[in-house]
């Protein structure tokens, strides 16, 4: 037990959707491991919201076990979504459907970030008839290719997974 005050951290429903639920056996093993060895990985937090480590946080607060917090600095919610997707895509227990969903969400978040960054640099840019930034300024294929290279998919597969998001 420790005498430090436990920080009140929040979860976010949108961020929670990005995390595939764990099996009961995993939860039991994680709790036992933290109880025996302490919390070895920090809880990643952005603006008081847990991005990674919500299960660790829950276990540590339940048993009054010390844990570290890593404060993440993101300019936007989309960058926080991108971080969560990257962390979750490292998991080996993801279902195929969840992996598609995460790739789609990552693609959308990175597209939104690219559009926001472009509009900050070029505030007078006219939008196309759909109210979007033209492909000649922010190319979907470029962003999809970067994601595809990172996770071993073709760019067309990444853009296709946008429908799952």
Q: Where are the model-predicted features located?
A:
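Short, charged/polar connector segments at secondary-structure boundaries
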Residues: 1-72, 86-93
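A general alpha-helix detector
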Residues: 14, 84, 143-146
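Generic hydrophobic, aliphatic-rich segments that mediate packing or membrane embedding
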Residues: 55-56, 81, 99, 103
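Acidic/polar active-site rim loop that often engages polyanionic ligands
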Residues: 78-87
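Alpha-helical interaction elements
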Residues: 92-165
